[in-house]
Amino acid sequence: MNTTSNTSNIIVGLSGGVDSSVTAALLKQQGYQVRGVFMQNWENDDNDEYCSIKQDSFDAIAVADIVGIDIDIVNFAAQYKDKVFAYFLQEYSAGRTPNPDVLCNAEIKFKCFLDYAVGQGADTIATGHYARKEARNGVHYLLKGLDRNKDQSYFLYRLKPFQLERAIFPLGGLEKPEVRRLAAEFNLPTAAKKDSTGICFIGERPFREFLQKYLPTDNGKMVTPEGKTIGEHVGLMFYTLGQRKGLGIGGAGEPWFVAAKDLTKNELIVVQGHDHPLLYTRSLVMNDLSFTLPERPKAGRYTCKTRYRMADAPCELCYLDDETAELVFDEPQWAVTPGQSAVLYDVDICLGGGIIQTTDKPVIITR
């Protein structure tokens, strides 16, 4: 339950998409004092056919006009580049696969935007995330969204208690089809707009083309765990563990998957078959821990997601030090990827998590 008085002054993050549009319309309908903010987190290039920022801003302005609220366009591009994009490049250059959307929420949407909103006199910010929040005895709990296919608590796990206290998620108790229906009822121009996909600053452009603009590439061998060369990769950063498509390996038999990266030799290790043992792990070590509650969860049994939309996996949490923890799973987990986030849950409560550093999967190549 989102606990706010309808005398609250709320600023909504309007992205130009259907979810934030309905968020603003619902709050306005419920009698809140509502304003909108469109966050420009990436510098728009008029010659960039893939960048949707300009159209998104037009859509956000049109929504604000129909809902009957004021809207500001605020540029956070410098902060985004410093806090999110630099990290994105650093992780890829180190051979890991980062999730910039997680960092964007913690550093931009619920920090820069929150600071801006408070400076403008807002009591609360609202976003179109599919998540819920409940206050119990003065403590704000982040919960999974009711629509389990759209639940976005995974991307919000790095929010701190002070950020949760000032945020509400009006769509948390709704399912996506209902949101689309409400958008049509409100006559919003975004009612039929396609959901955005991919990393926000990349948009729909080819990932390889984008990354090559910022990081040097180095081709190398594609090898089996036994050391047999079966192809050539175009740069380790373009591949992620568990990847099947785009490997360019033909022949008979089961499909090939990326199992590991050997950064020292610049080799991509691939295995045949979805159920190959090298694609599974029973434990992981995560660092850069972040929790949503005032006190970190005690060591013990929880469930975990190591990627978005996966089923919750039962596990045991053990702290190695203040910034590092180990998770041991009841069952082997497929394609656990360094750089991604491991997020802990106690039933529906999102407790927080950390960045996956290593797994117990052997990476020593036998030759």
Swiss-Prot record:
Please verify whether the record's keywords include Cell membrane: no
- Establish whether keyword Iron is in the entry: no
Provide the disulphide bond pattern.
C104-C200
EC nos: 2.8.1.13
- The active site of this protein is located at C104, C200
Reaction equation(s) it catalyzes = S-sulfanyl-L-cysteinyl-[protein] + uridine(34) in tRNA + AH2 + ATP = 2-thiouridine(34) in tRNA + L-cysteinyl-[protein] + A + AMP + diphosphate + H(+)
The segments labelled Interaction with tRNA in the record are 150-152, 307-308
Looking at the record, which segments are called Interaction with target base in tRNA? 99-101
One Gene Ontology BP term is: tRNA wobble position uridine thiolation
Q: Which GO terms describe its molecular function?
A: ATP binding; tRNA binding; tRNA-uridine 2-sulfurtransferase activity
Task: Please indicate which residues carry the site annotation Interaction with tRNA.
Answer: H129, Q340
GO CC term, one of those recorded:
cytoplasm
Which Pfam families does the UniProt record give? tRNA_Me_trans (PF03054), tRNA_Me_trans_C (PF20258), tRNA_Me_trans_M (PF20259)
Kindly state which keywords UniProt assigns to this record, in alphabetical order: ATP-binding, Cytoplasm, Disulfide bond, Nucleotide-binding, RNA-binding, Transferase, tRNA processing, tRNA-binding
Where found, per UniProt?
Cytoplasm
State the InterPro entries in the record: MnmA-like, MnmA-like_C, MnmA-like_central, MnmA-like_central_sf, Rossmann-like_a/b/a_fold
Task: Write out the function statement from the record.
Answer: Catalyzes the 2-thiolation of uridine at the wobble position (U34) of tRNA, leading to the formation of s(2)U34.
HAMAP family in the record, alphabetically?
tRNA_thiouridyl_MnmA (MF_00144)
Its protein name is tRNA-specific 2-thiouridylase MnmA
Question: What is the source species?
Answer: Neisseria gonorrhoeae (strain ATCC 700825 / FA 1090)
